[in-house]
Amino acid sequence: MATPPTLPVTNQQAVQSQPPINTPAFRTFFSRLSTSIRDGLSQRRPWTELIDRSSMARPESLTDALSRIRKNLAYFKVNYVAIVSLVLAFSLFSHPLSLLVLIGLLGGWMFLYLFRPSDQPLVVFGRTFSDRETLLALVLSTIVVVFMTSVGSLLTSALMIGVAIVCVHGAFVVPDDLFLDEQEPANAGLLSFLGGSATSAAAAVSGRV
C-alpha cells in the first residue's frame, strides 16, 4: 500500500516589530521624574505647620501680604505644588471626558513623537508621515484641544483656584525667623525635574526638526 505523499511544511519565523517608543529614553525620563518627585516630597514641610492657626494673622497692607507670599512660596513650595496638583487632579477626575482627552493628547505626544525612534517612520492607514508632518498634526491637535474644547477652560480654572488658595494662605501666614534664616537650595526638590524634562523634550524636538 502506497504511503500518501508528505505535504511540504514551511516554518515561518515570527517577525518581531520594533517597539513603538524609544524604550531607553522613555525609561530614563520616568526614572528621573520618579526620583525627583520622591526627593521633592521628602523635603515638604509638615502639613500641621501649614495649617497652624497660631502663625496666621491678617496682613497689615498689600505690601505686607506680597512680602509674606514671596517668603512662604520659598518655604512651602513643595506643599503648594502638591495643593495645586490636587486641585488639578480633582477637577480632571470630576470631568472624566476631559481627563480622557488630555491623556490621549499627552499619549500622542509621547508615543508618536517624543519617544518614538527617529529611524522608525510613522505609518497610518498605509501612509507614511514625516517627523514634520507628525509635529504639525500634534501641534494643531493641541491647539484644538486647549482652545476649542472644555479642557483648556477646565485647566485654567483649576490652576486659578489652586493659585488663589496658595496666595490666600501665603498672605495670612506670618513668616518667622526660621523662614528668613533658611537658604533656598537651587533647583532642589519637586521642581528640579522640570528643567531636565524640558531639556529632554527640547532636545528630542530639535533633533527631529
From Swiss-Prot:
Signal peptide: none
Localization: Endosome membrane
Cellular component, GO, one term: Golgi trans cisterna
Alphabetic keyword roster: Acetylation, Endosome, Membrane, Transmembrane, Transmembrane helix, Transport
GO BP annotation list: vesicle-mediated transport
UniProt membrane topology term: Multi-pass membrane protein
Predominant place of localization: membrane
Record-stated family: Belongs to the PRA1 family.
Function summary: May be involved in both secretory and endocytic intracellular trafficking in the endosomal/prevacuolar compartments.
Protein name stated in the entry: PRA1 family protein B1
Lineage, opening ranks: Eukaryota, Viridiplantae, Streptophyta, Embryophyta, Tracheophyta
